[in-house]
């Protein structure tokens, strides 16, 4: 699905997805993979390549800033992803409940075991399946990231900050991710 047709989720739809994931196998993993897109703005391919060592400090705490090397991101531009404190706490709980062998293990692994990471394509298909089963029409692998950027834009965050968070070199690219809605327009005119 192209970005132009990807849907930015409403708060109610985000909750629908969270409710759906809570009722099914691998609930915590699936919830966190989803939250990494809607609360941290990661691309699905970036979620797929995360390792324990990417997010966990040596003392066992979860980083607030995750560095993604150029060879692991789209267009080969390294970037730092910021993880809010709520998501850090959820990730810490997820990591601490498992017996991790080392920092090279995938953060999110398939049903085949802790050494089997999702491929970006398989994870994109997984998101499509979850959205469909949760009753979200037009949900795609881009929906979480588009939701993240649209949500921040609706709170008045500068397009320059959005571009930085998204790892975009051009604000023109970032603008394609933001879905302007009637509520945003209403709030804007009230500022005058």
Tell where the protein language model's regions lie, with residue ranges:
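Conserved tyrosine-mediated DNA breakage-rejoining catalytic core shared by Y-recombinases
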Residues: 49-78, 82, 87
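Short alpha-helical segment immediately N-terminal to, or the first helix within
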Residues: 36-37, 151-152, 165
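Basic, Lys/Arg- and aromatic-enriched nucleic-acid-binding interface segment
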Residues: 11-40, 44
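Catalytic-site neighborhood detector that most strongly recognizes the C-terminal catalytic loop/helix
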Residues: 68-72, 166-191
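C-terminal catalytic core of Y-nucleophile DNA break-rejoin enzymes
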Residues: 4-5, 73-92, 105-128
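Active-site-proximal segment of tyrosine recombinases
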Residues: 46-48, 139, 149, 157-168
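Helix-turn-helix DNA-binding elements, focusing on the entry/boundary residues of the two helices
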Residues: 33, 44, 146, 159, ...
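Catalytic phosphate/metal-binding cores of nucleic-acid and nucleotide-processing enzymes, i.e., regions
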Residues: 3, 38, 50, 114-115, ...
